[in-house]
């Protein structure tokens, strides 16, 4: 692959973090939105479902457009859409208008994920690409948690409208900056229009292993984002925790994720543990965390405990799960597309759209089972974790079958 320009790592970071940080800032204000529009919390939570569906549509379409017209113009277009939709959200007079605006916002911000990854592959190769991802990983885990912290303070001292004002300002700064210095990294613009997009699409649709990987990634990310859309109602509304303090609690999950990342690196590099075994360890952490979460949630439903103890009973199991999340997801993303090395960009956009639909489905389930306790959500987490383990077992069987055919 010919490299015509290199995008700096910090510019990649800004692209990568924009979507998850947008969502974690926003979810801190869900109880406030519910009171403002005088609606049920489950309806407010569905704005996140629309967000992830919009993200899936954006990944599928904007990723393809960047192959045809170049990375730079589509990134700028996506940021412009993000800004306009954030401004519309400020003036939303009902929840339906906000839902539409959130869908459009996610469509625009999806450039950060799909095109950010494409620009990284355009700019770096081999060990250099691995190094760039390695130095960005801690920040990718830390900054979204910082989003909850920022969102908590905005909600506590201002109102939910200022969350979207913040998004508008951040998007405007990025758009102005990227308009000046964002390089074009796609060398194959002239050749992309003849790429076999639909041929790849048809192959992926029939690939059982890819669908199983997509389910695992979608389920684990669904648990993560589902927690952020359910926890504010439990902690802020039911337990009367201040939004700013809730934002600080989100750092606990971030620290667990960072620990999981370092543990994965230690197991692979220092202990020479092969990838599939590290994934198995990740599933064990997740399953243990989700079982403990389910047990704790039912204890909290029937036994009155102090807020401090209740918070520990909610966050400790999720921290255990997040260690497993970090051990698992990066390796899963690597193996999912190993058979699509020559069409990584196209396959990646289709694969990303699939697992974001899974995330949207999980968040929809969270909204449908929303209640005054967290026990329903904890059971959903347990079901998703067990289902992911079963999916991984089936993947291992498919690998064995594949190796037998080759030999």
Curated annotation (Swiss-Prot):
Entry GO terms, CC: plasma membrane
Q: Where in the cell is it found?
A: Cell inner membrane
Main localization, broad class: membrane
Keywords, alphabetical: Cell inner membrane, Cell membrane, Membrane, Transmembrane, Transmembrane helix, Transport
Listed under GO biological process in this entry are: xenobiotic detoxification by transmembrane export across the plasma membrane
InterPro entries attached to this UniProt entry:
Efflux_drug-R_Bcr/CmlA, MFS, MFS_dom, MFS_trans_sf, Sugar_transporter_CS
Q: GO: which molecular function terms?
A: xenobiotic transmembrane transporter activity
Tell me yes or no: is GTP-binding among this UniProt entry's keywords.
no
What membrane topology term does the record carry? Multi-pass membrane protein
Give the top-rank taxon of the lineage listed in the UniProt record for this protein. Answer: Bacteria
Tell me which family the UniProt entry assigns to this protein: Belongs to the major facilitator superfamily. Bcr/CmlA family.
> What is the name of the protein in this document?
Uncharacterized transporter RP603
Q: Which organism is it from?
A: Rickettsia prowazekii (strain Madrid E)
